[in-house]
């Protein structure tokens, strides 16, 4: 598989108030770690932190489809890196999801996964996810809904 077919996406979701105003951020990188594009957006609904983490993955999957096109995404291997061990473990099928709202978000991710060759989720330390976190805070501070081509 060529490097062009492997992507790393750092995601973060955050809520001020938990639940409260929420936003998501995503940093798309090639396999070597070179940034390709950054995204962030304020969420319309008030969310918890965990819901915002799920929404960040959903947001990123949709942005990847737009960025690469549906045909290319079918040969794309994506590793999501996030600082929420709970969400990464739930998305990898290691933890059960008890809350109905979270189950609905899981199903959205599951359905979007079919557009890609392979997707996995990795929990990383918060320090390694700083840029995605910054994007969330920028959105919440009113500088949101941006796309940056790097």
Language model feature labels by segment:
Residues 53, 57:
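Short, conserved alpha-helix that lines the donor NDP-sugar binding/gating region
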């Amino acid at each position: 598989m060529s490097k062009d077919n492997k992507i790393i996406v750092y995601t973060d979701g955050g809520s001020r108030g938990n639940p409260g105003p929420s936003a998501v951020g995503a940093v798309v990188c090639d396999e070597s770690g070179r940034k390709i594009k950054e995204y962030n957006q304020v969420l319309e609904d008030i969310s918890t932190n965990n819901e915002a983490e799920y929404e960040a993955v959903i947001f990123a999957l949709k942005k990847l489809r737009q960025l690469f096109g549906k045909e290319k995404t079918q040969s794309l291997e994506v590793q999501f890196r996030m600082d929420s061990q709970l969400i990464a473990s739930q998305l990898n099928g290691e933890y059960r999801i008890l809350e109905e709202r979270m189950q609905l978000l899981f199903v959205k991710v599951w359905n979007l996964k079919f557009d890609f060759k392979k997707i996995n989720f990795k929990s990383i330390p918060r320090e390694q996810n700083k840029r995605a976190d910054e994007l969330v805070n920028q959105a919440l501070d009113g500088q949101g809904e941006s796309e940056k081509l790097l």
